[in-house]
């Protein structure tokens, strides 16, 4: 039985979405148990034999500064959910709340793994091969050193192997402005050197430099970048997908003939829209912590939040934390000062 601690108050829609998603998730996952964290008066209508309400009197808003969430709201649903992981009551916590606050709370309560300087946010983007490409970091670390990017690559490999059984040596690409080794700034060039060394020692399957379009081609399993670039790529991809879907709908409504064409093409269009629906890829892992935490989009609807729960459940069931620890320990000689001494 896998137990998830769910921050039911977080996100733009709060319990209205999170509770409905939790109910659907429980119906489809008989080996899962949920700790529903939030204000009891908002959660009182939820009853299920595999769900338990954990009271929390405060809520971290999407606008709360990190210091407010961390130091003043010590009984927030977000913090109490992460505390369940620290205490061993749950294997993973899930929240749609304020990203900065969640990262700060998770890092404060759970601490980073030995060998990791900074946690990273990782999620998946759909690709042309019918699968998904894992991209990290997506905003936790705007400025990164080459050593940080190497750590992200090691953690990303562990995540992909946990999500996709049989993919023990996923291909890693370094996001750059060109495939050539001479391209990129000094941090990227140095990162390339470290990743090639990791490949030579058998710690990573490094493909080489990749460009932005390779994310969607499915050229590699994992794309590594700093948080600034990753967040821009994520938001741009979601915007393009929404634009294409919207444009198709407009064009098929243009005349009686296009409406007839839409009816004929409906099965293909339906499958295409499903593949491009970013809600189905919701759920970003906060990697590098001594516990599992997943971040959902703040604007997530029921479908999207359920997907975040599913992704969190799958990684916990497939021992993501142990996989990250193992890969980091194996790559310790390459990871820099953080790997040389245990965390306090």
From Swiss-Prot:
This enzyme's EC code(s): 2.3.1.274
Molecular function terms, GO-annotated: phosphate:acyl-[acyl carrier protein] acyltransferase activity
Predominant localisation class: cytoplasm
Location(s) in or outside the cell: Cytoplasm
Keywords for the protein's UniProt record, in alphabetical order: Cytoplasm, Lipid biosynthesis, Lipid metabolism, Phospholipid biosynthesis, Phospholipid metabolism, Transferase
Superkingdom: Bacteria
Cysteine disulfide partners in this protein: none
One protein family per Pfam: FA_synthesis
Pathway membership, UniProt: Lipid metabolism; phospholipid metabolism
Leading EC class: transferase
Catalytic activity as recorded in UniProt: a fatty acyl-[ACP] + phosphate = an acyl phosphate + holo-[ACP]
One Gene Ontology cellular component: cytoplasm
SUPFAM superfamilies from the UniProt entry: Isocitrate/Isopropylmalate dehydrogenase-like
GO process annotations (BP): fatty acid biosynthetic process; phospholipid biosynthetic process
Family that this chain belongs to: Belongs to the PlsX family.
Primary role: Catalyzes the reversible formation of acyl-phosphate (acyl-PO(4)) from acyl-[acyl-carrier-protein] (acyl-ACP). This enzyme utilizes acyl-ACP as fatty acyl donor, but not acyl-CoA.
HAMAP family: PlsX
Record's subunit section: Homodimer. Probably interacts with PlsY.
Name under which the protein is recorded: Phosphate acyltransferase
Organism: Paracidovorax citrulli (strain AAC00-1)
